[in-house]
């Protein structure tokens, strides 16, 4: 179990070890590891790492909160409204709240993406304009 430390005002600040967080299959070819979420005690931000197989994609959807994607590895396409972009390692994409978007791995190898979402649960109020929602419940640290 990860250690925690008392912060100012007696708040507990968890230290989360990624090796203690299981990776879940969010949709075919897309796995997720929630690095920070409400399940970990985070209240204002969620962090998620996706590992994405070649050709795998998330369908058109929108969130009520802003999100940011950082491409760590690979090449992905991103659709924002009517525009389509190709982005690679170290590129950052800021997706405003309520903007329909989709994305997928367009490269020959695995892609790895880091996501940051504002709010307590970015998936709760998501609207899928195509396809179905992903599995999005982050497991608690130390649980399978």
PLM feature spans:
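A generic "binding-loop/recognition-motif" signal
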Residues: 56, 64-65, 83, 99-100, ...
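Short acidic-glycine-tyrosine-enriched beta hairpin
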Residues: 82-97
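A short hydrophobic beta-strand segment most commonly corresponding to one strand
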Residues: 49-50, 94, 109-126
């Amino acid at each position: 179990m990860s250690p925690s430390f008392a912060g100012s005002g007696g708040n507990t600040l968890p230290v989360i070890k990624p090796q203690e967080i299981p990776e879940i299959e969010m949709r075919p070819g897309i796995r997720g590891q929630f690095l920070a979420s409400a399940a970990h005690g985070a209240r204002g931000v969620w962090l998620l790492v996706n590992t994405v197989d070649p050709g795998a994609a998330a369908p058109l959807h929108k969130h009520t909160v802003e999100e940011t994607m950082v491409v760590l590895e690979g090449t992905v396409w991103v659709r924002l409204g009517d525009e389509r972009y190709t982005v690679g390692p170290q590129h950052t994409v800021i997706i405003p709240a309520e903007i329909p978007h989709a994305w997928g791995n367009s490269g020959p190898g695995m892609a790895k993406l880091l996501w940051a979402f504002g709010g307590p649960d970015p998936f709760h109020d998501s609207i899928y304009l195509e396809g179905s929602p992903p599995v999005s419940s982050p497991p608690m640290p130390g649980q399978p």
